[in-house]
A protein has these predicted regions:
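Hydrophobic core residues within well-ordered beta-strands of beta-rich domains
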Residues: 51-55, 72, 100, 131, ...
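Post-signal-peptide N-terminal segment of Sec-exported extracytoplasmic proteins
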Residues: 36-75, 139-141, 149
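Edge/loop elements at the starts and ends of beta-strands within beta-rich repeat scaffolds
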Residues: 26, 46-51, 64-67, 81-83, ...
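Bacterial Sec signal peptide processing site at the extreme N-terminus
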Residues: 12-36
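Bacterial N-terminal signal peptides that target proteins for export
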Residues: 1-7
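Intrinsically disordered, low-complexity Pro/Gly/Ser/Thr-rich segments with frequent PxxP/GP/PP motifs
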Residues: 80-115
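Terminal connector regions
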Residues: 110-161
Length: 162
């Protein structure tokens, strides 16, 4: 009888410990993304049918512990028109409270995207183009888990044409 009671108590203790670990994972804050003020996003023509977009992004870890930025899956919008999908394995280590500037490069094809005709004209005319990157971000926080945050707007701003 004592053995069964001990096993039941141990099982209850382990269940509470597992529940505690899940609540610890909920304490992880998502990394923050922002356009780098002195490095505007760039669009470069890639022939007549497309362009390359480089988003200079500052990624900040708001947590009091280090983590690894694992994945970024998103959708790029140019002037509110769907322009491209992106899926990056990043592997960027961010220390507690630290930040890093990374370029996010995305290729856009005008051939398959009729909604981008106006965007193409703005690019050819070397006019600024508004962008936003929406998506999800996966992090590896070691024993605290591997949460995925989003969907959310990761970064937005205006591009310059080079």
């Amino acid at each position: 009888m004592r053995t069964r009671l001990s096993i039941a108590a141990l099982g209850l203790f382990l269940l509470q410990a597992c529940a505690g670990m899940n609540s610890l994972g909920a304490l992880i804050q998502p990394p923050r993304f922002e356009q780098v003020p002195d490095q505007p996003a760039e669009i470069r023509m890639a022939g007549l049918n497309g362009a390359g977009v480089r988003l200079w992004t500052r990624v900040t870890n708001p947590n009091p512990f280090g983590l690894r930025l694992g994945t970024l899956k998103g959708t790029l919008y140019l002037e509110d028109a769907h322009a491209a999908d992106a899926d990056f394995p990043l592997g960027l280590a961010l220390g507690a409270g630290s930040d890093s500037v990374i370029p996010i490069d995305i290729s856009v094809s005008f051939a398959n995207l009729p909604g981008l005709g106006g965007v193409a004209r703005r690019i050819i005319g070397r006019q600024p183009v508004a962008y936003r990157l929406e998506g999800t971000v996966g992090v590896d926080a070691g024993r605290l888990g591997q949460p995925v945050f989003g969907p959310m707007t990761l970064v937005r701003g205006d591009t310059i044409v080079r």
